[in-house]
Amino acid sequence: LPEGMEQDPFFQQFFGQQFGGPGGNGRGNDQPRQQREQSLGSGVIVSPEGYVLTNNHVVDGATDVKVTLSDKREFKALVVGTDPKTDIAVLKLTGDKFNAITLGDSTKVQVGDYALAIGDPFGVGQTVTMGIVSAKGRGNLGIEDYEDFIQTDAPINPGNSGGALVNDRGELVGINTAILSHGSGGNEGIGFAIPINLARNVMGQILDHGKVTRGYLGVVIQPITPAMSKALNMNKLEGALVSDVSAKGPAKDAGVQRGDVILGINGNTVSDSNELRNTISMMQPGQTVKLTVSRNGGTKDIEVKLGELPLSKDEAASDTEKGGSKESLKGITVETLDSDTAQQLQLPESTKGVVVTGVDPSSPAADSGLRKGDVIQEVNHAPVKNAAEFEAAMSKSEKNGALLLVNRGGTTVFVAL
């Protein structure tokens, strides 16, 4: 086995422990010895000076990094910087000028384009596999904080992480990062690559500033579901719904409001909340952007000067009284929120609304994601302070559906019924 291959976590998932440890003969009968953990991955030389793009998870925690080229030459590498939020790392090889790959433009990649995955799967040596681009803009997979993956069926296996995804002109369009596998650890035709435009942006910031800074709007956003689209009288499932606005954020200062739907940035359509988040994150603090928002049936443009993404988020708070239990429409039981219940839910005592005390598991409310303990504060943008107001508001919304503002553990989200 190539040195270190058996320590790769993907290798262990695929083959188990049957091959023994480092230095073993595969029979598992070596004497115990002190071991040094090793792992492997791939990378791409992107400049003649020897800068290399790879994944953060390939080098995370490494004390020494060694790079072996396809011609068997070996080089020590310095980790210049990393960005765990996108899983990008930048390395620097020590040595003379290097042959570098040509960087492409990932915005020009189309579904159906040929794609080649280049890397060192299982440590067997440089390997090229071929497929097509299966999809673009894959997000919300829970792999990284910022996701805009190119999906490909070009076979990607353990050891390919950090390697190149190239187009039919040999241009680098992505950094292979992850595979979707049902327990085997091997390729099943669904691989994901970070677009080169995103990787290039991160690398540029690391080289220029030594760190990555991101633009910040100061809003909490969520996707537009079909039920929400109906409640908001929208014709298309596009944009990002603003479910909360930071009291001290740039969006608040510019006039963005909770319940706005952000449809565009600088004249470009925003397809969903993931695209909005990624687009803002690639912009720099201090940059002014023009947001196109939908509000109360009309659209307007709002200019926002971006701040810098903070390490923590501001939490939204609201305002209370007592009331009896009420059976509401669409499968939920609610009760007017009092100060004692607000304290139990770790909300300010002054919070007003109705607390969900029960949800019928076969009801539309359960399907929409409402939970016991949720605090409903608005129905169709109108505040509700007690169970009676909530009941009346829900009765009026039977025809077109209801858009509920829900406070869940101090965070507000919209739920459509």
Give the ranges of each region predicted by the language model:
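C-terminal recognition in membrane/secretory proteostasis and scaffolding
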Residues: 35-38, 42-44, 48-51, 56, ...
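Glycine-biased strand-turn-strand hairpin within the trypsin-fold
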Residues: 1-49, 60-66, 73-74, 85-88, ...
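Solvent-exposed loop/turn segments at secondary-structure junctions
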Residues: 59, 84-86, 97, 107-109, ...
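Active-site loop architecture of trypsin-fold serine endopeptidases
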Residues: 37, 62-65, 98, 118-132, ...
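A short, compositionally biased micro-patch
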Residues: 46-47, 60-61, 70, 82-84, ...
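Active-site substrate-binding loop(s) of clan PA
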Residues: 68, 78-80, 97-124, 157, ...
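Beta-strand signatures of extracellular beta-sandwich domains
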Residues: 66-68, 264
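Short histidine-centered loop motifs in beta-beta connectors
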Residues: 100-108, 158-159, 176, 245-246, ...
